[in-house]
Amino acid sequence: VAVDNRVDLFPESQSMVIDANWTVRNTHATPIQDVHVSMGDDKQLVAVDLGGQTLSMHDADLGYRIYRLQKPLQPGETRSVHFRAVQKPNGITAGQAPSNIVDNGTFFNSRVLPSFGYNEGAEISDRNERRKRDLGEPRRMPKLEDEAARANTYIANDADWLDFRTTICTAPDQVALAPGYLLKETTVNGRRCFSYAMDRPMLNFYAYLSARWEVRRAKYKNIPVEVYFDPAHGYNVDRMIEAVQKSLTYYEANFTPYQHRQVRIIEFPGYARFAQSFANTIPYSEAIGFIADLRDPDKVDYVFYVTAHEIAHQWWAHQVI
């Protein structure tokens, strides 16, 4: 129900340390004795504190752990938990090396942190293989009338909307961003630290970015619209701002008022080719808009439609899901 993360980012060495401090609540009718924890890269999860626990199962290949609580979490009870995750270069691997922490243009989201609950995504899905192992038939999609299943979305399972606060520290020549509103900026040991908080509950889905950007600012009504971009990639920034303004005009007229006090579009390098909408904050790859050639009027203006699509997620996901 609450997140307060401390992120220490070191772009120059492609490394970071995250101390995740969360408040969790048992919303079920029975005590919780065992806690299932999934981690995308198991070796990055270096510390776990669930208020007293023992590790009863650990599958490092799947990044899956089961902890038994020394004191079960009672119905309605809240508890503070802590995780520490460390990411750093680890030589050359058989797969693709992590590329989201870079010298200029870091972007990663909350999926680098642990998640709670049984992970159906790790189940064997092949029907023949399941029969060989006597695992029964694969789970079917829930019925539309199953209200309990509505707590599970493509973003998170059985997760409440939460209060979000965070501090991110980065190199002295960079700006670090996260969803929410800037509370303060400080300098600690020569590094720039930015503290953010969201003023209303939000999904358990957030991002962190750090780079040396130029910023172009405009407004929609009294709402600041900001685009953070590489100084060499300013070609389509005005078109993005126009797309934000026109999208907000249409969505407010046909849906509901925009729920936040700012809109930020933030460029990240072409190591990924997508944009992703978080609460009031939209990371946006250089490869799908910032360096697009829009001079031919007969070609589809995908800068406009990608921007409009991401703004729409501020309603469809970040209000209704």
List PLM regions with ranges:
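Short, solvent-exposed beta-strand/turn "edge" segments of beta-rich domains on protein surfaces
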Residues: 7-15, 155-157
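Ligand-binding face of N-terminal immunoglobulin V-set domains in extracellular IgSF glycoproteins
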Residues: 21-41
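A surface-exposed beta-strand-loop module
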Residues: 31-32, 42-104, 152-156, 189
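Glycine/proline-rich low-complexity spacer/linker segments in large multi-domain proteins
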Residues: 86-160
